[in-house]
A protein has these predicted regions:
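Active-site-adjacent structural elements that line small-molecule/cofactor binding pockets in enzymes
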Residues: 1-147
């Protein structure tokens, strides 16, 4: 299993949460068990996640829906991610992306930390079709969370 190999020979396993927390959480348990088995301690536990911080929770999903659907439909057309069997965008995004206002995004980040034990977040905040002004506003709000 690749996460055991990462524990054995890598410095850290970089999680890319495109499969959702339901699949990632058990893999993290396997990874941590393998780290213990191999006597390894990585310097950090990183994760890469799509993130959008809107001004209002009620509109955040709608603001980034088109660009993220475009991106993940492209992945599906390449055979990398099946979107055809998924329900709504909100269902697809749940436990896979961090989207909301400043309060809900901060809560989600805390939930990821608690559930996975991750301590380093690489937030992907820009996608084809998302206007640059929205990208910069989202990044500013993300920074406000931790300022």
């Amino acid at each position: 299993m690749s996460v055991r190999r990462a524990a054995r020979i890598g410095d850290a396993w970089l999680i890319v949460n495109t499969s959702g927390l339901g699949k990632v959480a058990p893999l993290m348990q396997t990874y941590r068990a393998a780290l213990k088995e191999y006597g390894r301690t990585p310097m950090e536990f990183p994760i890469t996640v799509e993130c959008y911080v809107g001004a209002h929770y009620a509109t955040a999903h709608e603001e980034c829906r088109g660009p993220l659907e475009y991106k993940y439909n492209a992945y599906a057309s390449w055979g990398l991610q099946d979107r055809s069997t998924q329900g709504s965008f909100e269902d697809f995004a749940r436990d896979r992306f961090i989207i909301g206002d400043k309060v809900s995004v901060k809560e989600e980040i805390a939930r990821y930390r608690e559930l996975l034990g991750v301590d380093h977040f690489i937030m992907r905040c820009q996608w084809p079709g998302l206007p640059q002004e929205r990208v910069l506003d989202s990044i500013q709000r993300l920074g406000d969370i931790f300022a």
